[in-house]
């Protein structure tokens, strides 16, 4: 299950590594229903080599400063997708229940994992009440990658009511970059990552575009690969984008346009693969429902609380988790993720042997686990034995 503003493709690097190392396993990645609102028409053409870098840039971004560009991307208006204000945890869990059901039909073990907000969604699923039955009854394990939900201080019912009322008059979608264009973060990342793969050494078109955020711009004109790496690296990316940061590298010492030098645990190419797309799918969510993030504040490790009724959250089987739990913490989730996993295990009476905790808060950024090189990736090195034990 992807995290905030994330799409199915960003599990691609780890998925390929896992199925190569663990014969018999499949990795299914969820593209939530909000991803169906995205317009991949020209981006798909670029990936297929049928559109140029300039054409794809103009279609999605260039038209904002050049009214002569037509046809161009048009985002749905808030009014036209007003129904998305209801796309919260209940909707996401209902959709995920269908996916888990299909996986169970194969007859093997089913392990549910999630990164970031996806970890909270995975926790919600495992503790969800499906007509008196716990969601964990469908599962053989739980993998929480720098995201989870533990019991403690859920949102109050009054605060939940206030947030719901505010959402009714604001955009249904998260504006991660703050440009008043909720889709822009997804488009920037999808285009930047795809250009880093398709035209890595060409000059970045975004760099000289007048609306490109200054916080993302290197001090010199970069290649596509360098622009992408610079924007997402922990040393140079803005703090506001900590959700997508990795230890990638740095600008090359020379060159015009300036290239990129890998010197971190995550090569820039693997980082780009995580966010670039295949046909119709990329590693971002251009339209992340604010209701989904709001609802996560009431999951509370599956312990019922007054906000549940306000937000239509049904995670109430927090003491019925009798499946192995794995948790991996980076600098963003930090001790909170490990504490949440520990609390989940404790409240269900899970034996210590059923809990695997991996603390890399001092060395891993939030997205390093999903894209770090396999030979350096401590997530892969520790989750693979966890999965092997479940299968045996």
Residue ranges and their predicted role:
Residues 328-357:
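Conserved loop-alpha-helix segment in the C-terminal half of the alpha/beta-hydrolase fold
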Residues 153-328, 332-336:
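Alpha/beta-hydrolase
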Residues 46-104:
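Alpha/beta-hydrolase active-site loop
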Residues 303-320, 326, 349-392:
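Catalytic active-site module of serine/aspartate enzymes centered on a nucleophile-bearing elbow/loop
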Residues 1-62:
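Short, surface-exposed "cap/lid" segments of acyl-processing enzymes
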Residues 113-122:
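Gly/Ala-rich beta-loop-alpha elbow adjacent to hydrolase catalytic centers
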Residues 132-154:
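A conserved short beta-strand
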Residues 36-40, 148-159:
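A short beta-to-alpha transition loop/helix N-cap that caps and shapes the active-site region
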